[in-house]
Amino acid sequence: MAKKDYYQILGIPKSAEEREIKKAYKRLAMKYHPDRNQGDKNAENKFKEIKEAYEILINEEKRTAYDQYGHAAFENGYNQNNTYSTFTSSTDFGDIFGDVFGDIFGGSRNQRVKKGADLCYNMEISLEEAVKGTTKEIRIPTFQKCKTCYGMGTSTGTKPNGCSTCHGKGQIHIRKGFFTVQQSCPTCNGIGTVIKNPCRMCRGQGRIKTNKTLSVKIPPGIDTNDKIRLSKEGEAGTNGAQPGDLYVQMKVNKHPIFEREENNLYCEVPINFTMAALGGEIEVPTLDGRVNLKIPSETQSGKLFRIRGKGVKSVQSRSRGDLLCRVVVETPVNLNEKQKYLLSELGNSFNGFRGDKNSPRSKRFFDGVKRFFDDLTK
C-alpha cells in the first residue's frame, strides 16, 4: 500500500516554514495522541503517520531528500519502530509540548550548563575622583572556577559518568493524565552526568566560594547611578558555562563647596558689600586649583559668573563643562560705633533707603507697595 504524502498528512503546503510544521504537528499530535485515545487503533496509526511526517519535514536534510526522491529516500534507512511508546527520538512528544505544559507540571528544560550569576557592587567616590577619573581596588565575595578540577567537579584522573536514570539526557518523561511531559532528572538534577569521585577542593561543585580582588578603572565624568560593566567578572558558571558579569554602581558623594548639575559645577562666593558696589577681584576655588574672578562694580547678590572649562569632562566626548559662581553679598555684622556712624552717613547720602539713583530696585519695590495699598483704599 502506497504511503501518504507527508505534507498532506500534516495538512501543510510544500512551501511551509518550520514554524508552520511545528504548529501543525502540535495540533494533530494532541488530537491523535494515544494517551487521549486509549484502545483506538486508528488513532494510534494516525499518530504514527503524523510523527513520521514531522520527523522528516522538520529535519532540513531529510526534507530535501524527501522533496527530491519521495518515500524511496528512506526505504533502507528510516526506522519507525516504537514511534510513540518509547519517545527516544530528538523530536519526542515531550519536546514539542514541554514549552506549553512544562510550567504547569513542573517540567524543566535542559539544565546542563548555566551561566554564572551577575553581581552588583556599590561604590562611593569623591567629586574630585569623579571629575578626574581614578582606579579603585575592590574585594567581592563570589564563586570562582575550581583551579583543582578546572570546573569539572571530578577528582584528578577521573571524569563524570553518564546518568543511568536519564541516560545522559538530563530529562525524564512523566505521564500526567493524558500527557507525557519532560521533567528534570532527579538523579543528576538535569545535568545528564553524575560524579562518583568528586573533587576534594570544591566537593564536586566545580566552583568554590572565595573573595576576589579587582581593579576598577573609573573614567573622568562618571556620575551617580552610572554603572561600569566588567565582563565575565561575575560568578563562575556551572559545568563549563561562561561566568556572569560584574556591575559597579556608582555614587558620587556630596562636596562641601561644589554642587554638580550634569557637566557644570556650581559654588557660592561670598563678597562684602563694598566689593559689590565698587568692584574688585577675588580668588575662587576650582577642582584644578585657585583662579581669580573679577567682580564688576554694582554687582547684585545672586549674580552668576561663568568660568569656562572648569567643570566636569563629559564621558561621551572631550568637552568639559563650566564652573558657575553665584555671588552672595554679605551684610556686615559685629560693627563698632565708628562703622555704624559711617554706614549711617552713607545711608543719608543715598537720600534714605529709597534713593532713586543709588537703589533703583528698592525704589521700584516700595513704589509697588504704595500702589498696592492705594488700590485697596479706593
Swiss-Prot record:
It comes from the Bacteria. Its cofactor is Zn(2+). CXXCXGXG motif repeats lie at residues 146-153, 163-170, 185-192, 199-206. GO terms for molecular function: ATP binding; heat shock protein binding; unfolded protein binding; zinc ion binding. GO terms for cellular component: cytoplasm. Zn(2+) 2 binds at residues 163, 166, 185, 188. Disulfide bonds: none annotated. Binds 2 Zn(2+) ions per monomer. SUPFAM superfamilies: Chaperone J-domain, DnaJ/Hsp40 cysteine-rich domain, HSP40/DnaJ peptide-binding domain. Keywords: Chaperone, Cytoplasm, DNA replication, Metal-binding, Repeat, Stress response, Zinc, Zinc-finger. The keyword Zinc-finger applies. It holds the Pfam family DnaJ_C. It is found in: Cytoplasm. GO terms for biological process: chaperone cofactor-dependent protein refolding; DNA replication; protein refolding; response to heat. Coiled coil: none annotated. Zn(2+) 1 binds at residues 146, 149, 199, 202. Its main location: cytoplasm. A zinc finger (CR-type) spans 133-211. The keyword Chaperone applies. Residues 5-70 form the J domain. Homodimer. Participates actively in the response to hyperosmotic and heat shock by preventing the aggregation of stress-denatured proteins and by disaggregating proteins, also in an autonomous, DnaK-independent fashion. Unfolded proteins bind initially to DnaJ; upon interaction with the DnaJ-bound protein, DnaK hydrolyzes its bound ATP, resulting in the formation of a stable complex. GrpE releases ADP from DnaK; ATP binding to DnaK triggers the release of the substrate protein, thus completing the reaction cycle. The J domain is necessary and sufficient to stimulate DnaK ATPase activity. Zinc center 1 plays an important role in the autonomous, DnaK-independent chaperone activity of DnaJ. Zinc center 2 is essential for interaction with DnaK and for DnaJ activity. PANTHER family: CHAPERONE PROTEIN DNAJ (PTHR43096:SF48), DNAJ HOMOLOG 1, MITOCHONDRIAL-RELATED (PTHR43096). Belongs to the DnaJ family. This is Chaperone protein DnaJ. It comes from Buchnera aphidicola subsp. Schizaphis graminum (strain Sg). The gene is dnaJ.
